C-alpha cells in the first residue's frame, strides 16, 4: 500500500492515464483505504530465482528458457520502465520447477524514480537475463570471459 500522498497521486495518475499494469494478467485492481492506495496482484508462492535458480535450472537450455521467460514477463507486465525497475528486485522474481518466471509484486515505492529512462530499464533486464544464463557457470570459472562459447557469446 502507498501512504505517501505525492507517490499515491503519481501512481494513481499512471493507473488512469497510462493504464499502468492493465495489460498484466496478475493485476487484479486497486483501491484506496484509510488514505492508502492499494494495488492488488495475484500472489505466487515465493520460489525466488535468487535462491532456487540453481536447483530448478540445471542445464543451460533451462537457463535459456527462463531467461526468455523473464524477458516475456517484463514485456507483458505493463509496468513501464520506472515501475519495471522496481519489479527486478530479487524479491519479486520467482522460478517454478518447470522453469517458468513469475513476478511477485512487493514494490518498494520508496525506491521508485519516476521518469527512469527506458535504456536503464533495458540494461537492468539484460543484467538479470545474463545472471540467469550464467547460473551454471558462475563459480566454475574465474571470470565471465572464461565461460564456454554458448554463454560467452552473450
Please name every model-derived segment.
Residues 2-66:
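Conserved structural core of kinase catalytic domains
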Residues 2-5, 44-46, 73, 98, ...:
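Generic structural motif
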Residues 19, 78, 133-136:
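Conserved NTP-handling cores and scaffolds of large molecular machines
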Residues 38, 43, 66, 76, ...:
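Broad hydrophobic/π-residue packing in well-ordered secondary structure
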Residues 67-71:
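Residue(s) on the long, well-ordered alpha-helices that form the structural core
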Residues 72-84:
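Protein kinase catalytic-loop region centered on the HRD/HxD motif
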Residues 83-85, 90-154:
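C-lobe/activation-segment region of protein kinase-like
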Amino acid at each position: 500500500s502507498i501512504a505517501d500522498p505525492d507517490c499515491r497521486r503519481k501512481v494513481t495518475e499512471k493507473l488512469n492515464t497510462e493504464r499502468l499494469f492493465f495489460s498484466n494478467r496478475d493485476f487484479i485492481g486497486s483501491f484506496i483505504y484509510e488514505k492508502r492506495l492499494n494495488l492488488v496482484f495475484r500472489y505466487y508462492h515465493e520460489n525466488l530465482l535468487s535462491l532456487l535458480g540453481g536447483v530448478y535450472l540445471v542445464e543451460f537450455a533451462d537457463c535459456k528458457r527462463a531467461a526468455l521467460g523473464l524477458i516475456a514477463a517484463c514485456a507483458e507486465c505493463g509496468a513501464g520502465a520506472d515501475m519495471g525497475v522496481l519489479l527486478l528486485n530479487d524479491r519479486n522474481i520467482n522460478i517454478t520447477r518447470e522453469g517458468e518466471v513469475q513476478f511477485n509484486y512487493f514494490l518498494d515505492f520508496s525506491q521508485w524514480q519516476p521518469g527512469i529512462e527506458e535504456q536503464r530499464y533495458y540494461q537492468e533486464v539484460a543484467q538479470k537475463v545474463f545472471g540467469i544464463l550464467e547460473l551454471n557457470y558462475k563459480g566454475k570459472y574465474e571470470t565471465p570471459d572464461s565461460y564456454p562459447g554458448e554463454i560467452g557469446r552473450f
